[in-house]
Amino acid sequence: MATTFASVSVTCWGIQFIKGFRQGALCTNPAIQTLIDYTYDFVNPQLGEQFARRILDQGADVVFAVAGPTGHGTVITTTYSQKWAIGVDDDYYYSVYGGGNVPGAEYLLSSVMKRIDNAVYGTIGDTAKNC
């Protein structure tokens, strides 16, 4: 049985990301086992590395790390271990893996981005039109 694993720091955004991840995994394979765990730290890449090693030892096939810099440590350790990972908040392929020039890039499935920049840009544009 395939196992996916999601890590998250405690934030409302993180919980929404994880719900979507779980629903997508179950839609793809109703028998899939999804495991969710929390780091309770958003700025500790070393903790993310330790977390990744622990969840990989539990058999995770895909790791979705919603945990800021802590998640960076989780994703990097996961991909270096030749397991699949999904990043969050920025395009990890460029920001973490140098456009594919860093080992492990081939195990990065995707990155989930909120694109708040688009919302801010649109709001400023709308406000400027109404002035």
Regions found by a protein language model. Name each.
Residues 1-131:
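A residue-level marker of the well-folded mature domains of exported/periplasmic proteins
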